[in-house]
Amino acid sequence: MSRIGLKVIEVPEKVTVTKNGDDITVKGPKGELTRYFDPRITFEQKDGEIHFSRSSEADKALHGTERANLASMIEGVTDGYVKKLTLVGVGYRAVAQGKKLTLNVGYSHPVEFEAPEGITVKTPSATSIEIEGISKQVVGQFAAEIRDVRPPEPYKGKGIRYEDEYVRRKEGKTGK
């Protein structure tokens, strides 16, 4: 039995959840999200709660996945998601101008990113980046793409890392 799939989702008053064919739309104070919802999983909405059920035992994993996706959509349109990145290294800095993010991270050229639709990028300081949006998947994907430009290396810890990420350090070579 899918334990995640059996959990009930509490729907805030400001949020509406509607199903249109195979798509599900969630509207809230921060915006609107639409995504494909597998027809093998059904849901029932009553008294500000959503209950999920599946048609067969073979759809056990899908049951929990669809429930988690809908829960993250509801959280996104009410509170939104924020990912914070930190740049560690001499001369590493980031500058955000509107939808454009420019990184100087030790290459001979600056690396530029265009923020996807619905994503805002801020640089509170030259060495920190904040990515905000209503879609958990898009925010996480964009943060991962930025981190992949210069992931933290294990010897000095230089690179782009998530704010709460722990970088496992290695010892360098020992002399004779």
Curated annotation (Swiss-Prot):
Gene Ontology MF term list: rRNA binding; structural constituent of ribosome
Pfam families linked: Ribosomal_L6 (PF00347)
Q: Which Gene3D superfamilies does the record associate with it?
A: Ribosomal protein L6, alpha-beta domain
InterPro entries membership: Ribosomal_uL6-like, Ribosomal_uL6-like_a/b-dom_sf, Ribosomal_uL6_a/b-dom, Ribosomal_uL6_bac-type, Ribosomal_uL6_CS
Asked if the record carries the keyword rRNA-binding, the reply is yes
Q: Does the keyword Transcription regulation apply?
A: no
Q: Which GO terms describe its biological process?
A: cytoplasmic translation
The SS bond pairs are: none
| Keywords, alphabetical | Ribonucleoprotein, Ribosomal protein, RNA-binding, rRNA-binding
Q: Name one GO cellular component term.
A: cytosolic large ribosomal subunit
Assembly and oligomerization: Part of the 50S ribosomal subunit.
UniProt record similarity statement: Belongs to the universal ribosomal protein uL6 family.
Function text: This protein binds to the 23S rRNA, and is important in its secondary structure. It is located near the subunit interface in the base of the L7/L12 stalk, and near the tRNA binding site of the peptidyltransferase center.
Q: What is this protein called?
A: Large ribosomal subunit protein uL6
State the organism named in the record. Lactobacillus johnsonii (strain CNCM I-12250 / La1 / NCC 533)
